[in-house]
Curated annotation (Swiss-Prot):
Gene Ontology biological process terms in this record: exocytosis; neurotransmitter secretion; protein transport; regulation of synaptic assembly at neuromuscular junction; synaptic vesicle transport
Name used for this protein in its record: Protein lin-7 homolog B
Gene field: LIN7B
Coiled coil: none
Motif Kinase interacting site, residue range(s) on this chain: 1-13
InterPro entries: L27_C (IPR014775), L27_dom (IPR004172), L27_dom_sf (IPR036892), LIN7 (IPR017365), MAM_complex_regulator (IPR051109), PDZ (IPR001478), PDZ_sf (IPR036034)
Alphabetic keyword roster: Cell junction, Cell membrane, Exocytosis, Membrane, Postsynaptic cell membrane, Protein transport, Synapse, Tight junction, Transport
Gene Ontology MF terms in the entry: protein domain specific binding; protein-macromolecule adaptor activity
Domain L27: 10-65
Membrane topology: Peripheral membrane protein
Composition bias type Polar residues, residue spans: 197-207
Amino acid sequence: MAALVEPLGLERDVSRAVELLERLQRSGELPPQKLQALQRVLQSRFCSAIREVYEQLYDTLDITGSAEIRAHATAKATVAAFTASEGHAHPRVVELPKTDEGLGFNIMGGKEQNSPIYISRVIPGGVADRHGGLKRGDQLLSVNGVSVEGEQHEKAVELLKAAQGSVKLVVRYTPRVLEEMEARFEKMRSARRRQQHQSYSSLESRG
């Protein structure tokens, strides 16, 4: 069981770094071009995505040891998450409240179907739809810090059902893969329907 840790507040630290860069620019002690470039990086959406994923993993990874060990393990897990998303949209964190009406989205896929787990539908007017942030075509990477990559469909369902109060999802947007997966499933369903029809026709001819 992981030791209790204080939640990270990296957004505050990034803001302080930006303020420091602004002071350095005003002082004229360092080349302003380099300071401005670093400031743009810290204020970019990419940096925000890294910070959100790092904070979420830091708060939920089951790691014992010093703060330094925890930070190192979290950094490795964050790099792994972004490396896995290479060529796709970067991971992002979506937090939704857990209420009696459910989370308001459906998932499909899983190890048993030889595919990632995806958000296949965001229910109009549901919790996910009202809070925004989650899209059809998002691949589900983890639920409350537990990875569901390469896992059975049922594991993701169980994690979502077990969540209390709220649920933190790490997702990345890869709609093309979902479309390919749905096309493959539809092809399999069509093949089964044809097979059933042929079997029924064969029985009729014998009768």
